[in-house]
């Protein structure tokens, strides 16, 4: 993972845990626009040992991170302050199932009791590493859904996951590559973001980005910033704009994912008047699980969800190549 992205995730998690007073750290780092904030908190995570990911061997992730098996279809959700993810893939007449449980410190959660049920057949999962629980389940015909049952000392979660209507699911790698190129070709982009670290702590913000080096955001009941090239302006709630130097160059608009593995088309749906593909994938570079809604006509990413270490994000995108109006504050 690039150092800037690692710092972004760690600082975001710490800021959310600290509360609204620290929300400026979240906003600055989520934008890929480093500002005048401390990054010392990122050091422990950066020192984590590394291990290759089978699906993308050139992208290392922490050894204690429960990455999905290669080629499996992936799903993810928040479960308290943890990420709960499912990977499913055909293995002949059996179904390979893996639950990944990622804790808020970026390591897999051990010692859980996990089972899977498909069409009234159940299997107990065996541990396959930190936060990794895996089973092979015989299936007759096409599997429609998986029931994931996770039990721990103080928690119990039952999660029903609908599988793609087409099985095996269609590969989405080429589609995500095209969507990434379209994103990088945009002149402007706007989006609304909700970022949470658990069920209690969350912030909402509105963003505008313009090529090649302009971005502006406003956090609900929080900070605002404008970045233009090498200058930035920041404003605390109820305060005045303060001008300073932008400490690192930025390039916008760019996708939030770093790399793509395990990409599959989940289904086709209608979203806000657009025909879209829903695509899920794992990003070893973040690392985290993503789901994107891709417009079939334009290949614009209309919505994006991400589940990473203490970092649960949902973005809704609009204003593609529309005037963004990013100027120095008056």
Identify the residue ranges that each predicted region occupies.
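N-terminal leader/targeting segments and the immediate start of mature chains
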Residues: 36-48, 52-56, 164-212, 327-330
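Short amphipathic beta-strand segments in non-cytosolic proteins
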Residues: 115-125
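An acidic-aromatic
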Residues: 200-254, 312-313, 317
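Flexible, processing/modification-adjacent segments and terminal tails
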Residues: 170-175, 228-285, 329-330
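Edge beta-strands of extracellular beta-sandwich domains
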Residues: 155-166
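Beta-strand-rich domain onsets/edges
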Residues: 30-31, 35-46, 50-98, 102-110, ...
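Gly/Pro-enriched, hydrophobic low-complexity segments
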Residues: 194, 216, 274-330
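Aromatic sugar-binding surface patches on proteins
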Residues: 128-135
């Amino acid at each position: 993972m690039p150092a800037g992205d690692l710092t972004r995730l760690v600082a975001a998690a710490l800021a959310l845990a600290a509360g609204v007073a620290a929300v400026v750290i979240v906003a600055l780092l989520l934008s890929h626009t480093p500002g005048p904030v401390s990054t010392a908190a990122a050091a422990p995570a950066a020192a984590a040992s590394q291990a290759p990911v089978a699906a993308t061997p050139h992208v290392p992730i922490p050894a204690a991170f429960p990455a999905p098996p290669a080629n499996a279809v992936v799903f993810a959700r928040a479960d308290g302050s943890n990420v709960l993810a499912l990977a499913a893939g055909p293995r002949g007449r059996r179904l390979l199932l893996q639950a990944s449980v990622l804790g808020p410190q970026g390591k897999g959660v051990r010692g859980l009791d996990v089972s899977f049920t498909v069409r009234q057949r159940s299997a107990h999962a065996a541990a396959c590493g930190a936060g990794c629980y895996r089973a092979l389940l015989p299936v007759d015909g096409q599997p429609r859904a998986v029931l994931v049952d996770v039990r721990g000392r103080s928690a119990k979660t039952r999660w029903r996951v609908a599988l793609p209507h087409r099985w095996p699911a269609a590969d989405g790698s080429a589609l995500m590559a095209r969507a990434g190129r379209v994103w990088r070709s945009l002149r402007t982009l706007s989006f609304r973001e909700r970022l949470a670290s658990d069920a209690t702590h969350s912030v909402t913000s509105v963003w505008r980005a313009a090529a090649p080096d302009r971005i502006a955001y406003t956090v609900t009941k929080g900070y605002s910033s404008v970045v233009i090239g090498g200058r930035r302006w920041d404003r605390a709630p109820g305060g005045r704009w303060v001008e300073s130097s932008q400490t690192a160059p930025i390039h916008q608009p760019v996708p939030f994912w770093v790399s793509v593995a395990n990409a599959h088309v989940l289904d086709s749906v209608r979203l806000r008047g657009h025909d879209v593909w829903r695509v899920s994938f794992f990003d070893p570079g973040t690392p985290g699980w993503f789901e994107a809604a891709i417009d079939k006509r334009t290949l614009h990413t209309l919505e994006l969800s991400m589940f990473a270490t203490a970092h649960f994000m949902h973005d809704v995108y609009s204003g593609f190549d529309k005037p963004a109006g990013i100027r120095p504050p008056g």
